[in-house]
C-alpha cells in the first residue's frame, strides 16, 4: 500500500455543495426582469426574486421591495457553471473564508461566451458564491441530534484551494507572507 493510499479517505474528500449566482439591481420593474432573463440564460435555471429585508432610504428601497434575483445550482449544474465562470475571473487565496467557501464577482455579464451586448438591456454584473463541504456535514443541519463538525474534519482554506485547482484546472493566486500581514512594502 502506498503512502498516498494510507492518507486518502473518501469522507475527507471535499465536494461542491452549491453555487449561488446573484444579481442585485436595486429596484423592480424592467431592470429586474432583464436581470432575471440574463440569469436564466447564463445559469440555465429559473431565477428567484430577492427582496429587501429592511428599508434602506439611501437606495430608495422599502422592506419587501424586489431588489434582485438569484439562482442556486447544485450537482452537475453547479459543476458546469463553474467550468464556464472560473476561467473568466482571477481568484485569490484571500477570497476563501475559514471554512473553505469563496465568492467572486463578474463585472459584466457579456464576458460569458453565450452573452452578447444588447443596448436595450445594458450591462449587468453578478456575484457568485461557492459553498464547499465534506461528506458528513449534514449532522450540523439535521433537526434531530445535530452536532458540530470536529475541527479535524472541517474544510480549511488550503484544502479548498487545492480542490478547486485540481477539479477545475484554474490557478489561484497565492498571497505572499508580506502582503498577508497587511504590509505592501
Curated annotation (Swiss-Prot):
HAMAP family, per the entry: Ribosomal_uL5_A
Subunit-level organization: Part of the 50S ribosomal subunit; contacts the 5S rRNA and probably tRNA. Forms a bridge to the 30S subunit in the 70S ribosome.
Function summary: This is one of the proteins that bind and probably mediate the attachment of the 5S RNA into the large ribosomal subunit, where it forms part of the central protuberance. In the 70S ribosome it contacts protein S13 of the 30S subunit (bridge B1b), connecting the 2 subunits; this bridge is implicated in subunit movement. May contact the P site tRNA; the 5S rRNA and some of its associated proteins might help stabilize positioning of ribosome-bound tRNAs.
UniProt xrefs under InterPro entries: Ribosomal_uL5 (IPR002132), Ribosomal_uL5_arc (IPR022804), Ribosomal_uL5_C (IPR031309), Ribosomal_uL5_dom_sf (IPR022803), Ribosomal_uL5_N (IPR031310)
Keywords (A to Z) from UniProt: Ribonucleoprotein, Ribosomal protein, RNA-binding, rRNA-binding, tRNA-binding
Family: Belongs to the universal ribosomal protein uL5 family.
The keyword tRNA-binding belongs to this UniProt entry's keyword annotation: yes
Keyword Secreted applies: no
Protein's name according to its UniProt entry: Large ribosomal subunit protein uL5
Gene3D superfamilies from the UniProt entry: 3.30.1440.10
Top-level lineage group: Archaea
Coiled coil (residue ranges): none
GO cellular component, one term: ribosome
GO BP, sorted A to Z: translation
Gene Ontology molecular-function annotations: rRNA binding; structural constituent of ribosome; tRNA binding
A UniProt-annotated Pfam family: Ribosomal_L5
Amino acid at each position: 500500500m502506498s503512502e498516498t493510499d494510507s492518507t486518502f479517505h473518501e469522507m475527507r474528500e471535499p465536494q461542491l455543495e452549491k453555487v449561488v449566482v446573484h444579481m442585485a439591481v436595486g429596484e423592480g420593474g424592467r431592470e429586474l426582469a432583464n436581470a432575471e432573463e440574463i440569469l436564466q440564460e447564463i445559469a440555465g435555471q429559473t431565477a428567484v426574486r430577492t427582496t429587501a429585508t429592511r428599508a434602506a432610504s439611501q437606495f430608495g428601497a422599502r422592506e419587501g421591495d424586489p431588489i434582485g434575483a438569484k439562482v442556486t445550482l447544485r450537482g452537475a449544474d453547479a459543476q458546469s457553471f463553474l467550468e464556464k465562470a472560473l476561467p473568466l475571473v482571477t481568484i485569490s487565496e484571500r477570497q476563501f473564508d475559514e471554512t473553505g467557501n469563496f465568492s467572486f464577482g463578474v463585472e459584466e455579464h457579456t464576458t460569458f461566451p453565450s452573452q452578447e451586448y444588447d443596448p436595450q438591456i445594458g450591462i449587468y454584473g453578478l456575484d457568485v458564491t461557492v459553498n464547499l463541504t465534506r461528506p458528513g456535514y449534514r449532522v450540523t443541519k439535521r433537526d434531530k441530534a445535530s452536532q458540530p463538525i470536529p475541527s479535524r474534519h472541517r474544510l480549511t482554506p488550503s484544502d479548498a484551494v487545492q480542490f478547486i485547482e485540481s477539479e477545475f484546472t484554474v490557478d489561484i493566486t497565492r498571497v505572499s507572507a508580506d502582503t498577508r500581514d497587511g504590509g505592501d512594502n
